[in-house]
């Protein structure tokens, strides 16, 4: 059994990790930490886990994380980097669901996240945990940087075009929408029911923290610089990301065949039939990115529609997928749920 610890188990990604890991046949949950809620039974906070998780929250110091095989950080940005080195030195593998190790340019990371990086030497070692790109590197990793939610949907949507070299790379555009759970489990005015319901708005138009992460990936796929515009929006949904992506193609190519071939062996990427429009509810609760590709009115403009559940393929599900790869398990272990309808 894989001994698992979770640091920061009281947020939405933390409880989603617990939901998935509680029924994982190869996992033994050893510790779930929260300084504020130490001593509280996990099931008292999250009744959906009654009968599934018998642990209580503990402080990180009391959790015995160094005895785990792998520790997940479902914490705010800046927490994992303070504790990762000690865990790695103890032989523990680390999967960080925050952004501490995603961006390879440490100065760029510090600019966007407004803090000094505590272990910049580990950034180079960290493997970016997008399995559809880095599966082989994940297998040998000690430290995995789990991708962000927007970056997962956008990168998987653009990947086939850029790998094949058929898209003009100077004007890539991502128009993306997220449910309010993407903002985390905290009290902030803009995600209150009375503010978010019956409303739809753009935010961070001048610059979002996921922009450098996405751009970094797109430039790797393209093999050179890209021009990339990213505009996120907040929608009155709880879960879900819908990314509408725009690119001009420089060649006459069968786009449907291109996408189907690229993802034919990927269990968690579903390329829909030509003309389809994926819906966020079709991936609710599922570790799936559902994609459709269109060429608009016979022009050179390609429109890619990409949907994920921000808490599953955009966070906890992808983290479990990475763990499965890391420990040589079937990739879909504990991740076979279909989307919930209605």
Swiss-Prot record:
Question: What does the entry list under GO cellular component?
Answer: cytoplasm
Q: In which pathway does it act?
A: Amino-acid biosynthesis; L-arginine biosynthesis; N(2)-acetyl-L-ornithine from L-glutamate: step 3/4
Q: What is its main location?
A: cytoplasm
Q: Which reaction does it catalyse?
A: N-acetyl-L-glutamate 5-semialdehyde + phosphate + NADP(+) = N-acetyl-L-glutamyl 5-phosphate + NADPH + H(+)
Fetch the PROSITE patterns from UniProt: ARGC (PS01224)
Active site per UniProt: 149
Q: Which Gene Ontology BP terms does the record give? A: L-arginine biosynthetic process
- Localization per record: Cytoplasm
Q: Which family does it belong to?
A: Belongs to the NAGSA dehydrogenase family. Type 1 subfamily.
What is the protein name stated in its UniProt record? N-acetyl-gamma-glutamyl-phosphate reductase
């Amino acid at each position: 059994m894989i001994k698992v610890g979770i640091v920061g188990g009281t947020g939405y990604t933390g409880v989603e990790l617990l939901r998935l890991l509680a029924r994982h046949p190869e996992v033994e949950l050893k510790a779930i930490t929260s300084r504020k809620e130490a001593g509280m039974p996990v099931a008292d906070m999250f009744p959906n886990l009654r009968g599934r998780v018998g642990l209580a929250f503990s402080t990180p110091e009391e959790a015995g994380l160094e005895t785990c095989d792998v520790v997940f950080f479902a914490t705010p940005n800046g927490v994992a980097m303070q504790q990762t080195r000690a865990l790695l030195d103890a032989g523990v593998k680390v999967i960080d669901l925050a952004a501490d190790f995603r961006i390879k340019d440490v100065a760029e990371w510090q600019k966007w996240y407004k803090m000094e990086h505590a272990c910049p030497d580990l950034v180079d070692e960290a493997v970016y945990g997008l399995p559809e790109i880095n599966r082989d590197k994940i297998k040998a990793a000690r430290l995995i940087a789990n991708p962000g939610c927007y970056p997962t949907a956008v990168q998987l949507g653009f990947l086939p075009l850029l790998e094949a070299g058929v898209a003009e790379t100077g004007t890539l555009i991502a128009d993306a929408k997220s449910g309010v759970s993407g903002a985390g489990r905290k009290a902030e005015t803009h995600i209150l029911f009375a503010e978010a319901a019956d409303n739809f708005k753009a935010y961070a138009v001048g610059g979002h923290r996921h922009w450098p992460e996405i751009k970094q990936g797109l430039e790797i796929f393209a093999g050179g610089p890209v021009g990339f515009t990213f505009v996120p929006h907040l929608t009155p949904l709880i879960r879900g990301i819908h990314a509408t992506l725009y690119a001009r193609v420089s060649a006459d190519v069968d786009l449907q065949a291109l996408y189907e071939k690229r993802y034919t062996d990927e269990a968690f990427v579903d390329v829909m039939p030509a003309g389809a429009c994926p819906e966020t509810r079709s991936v609710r609760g599922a570790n799936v990115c559902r994609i459709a590709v269109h060429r608009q009115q016979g022009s050179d403009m390609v429109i890619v529609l990409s949907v994920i559940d921000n808490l599953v393929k955009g966070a906890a599900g992808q983290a479990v997928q990475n763990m499965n790869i890391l420990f040589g398990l079937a990739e879909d272990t504990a991740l076979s749920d279909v989307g919930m309808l209605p």
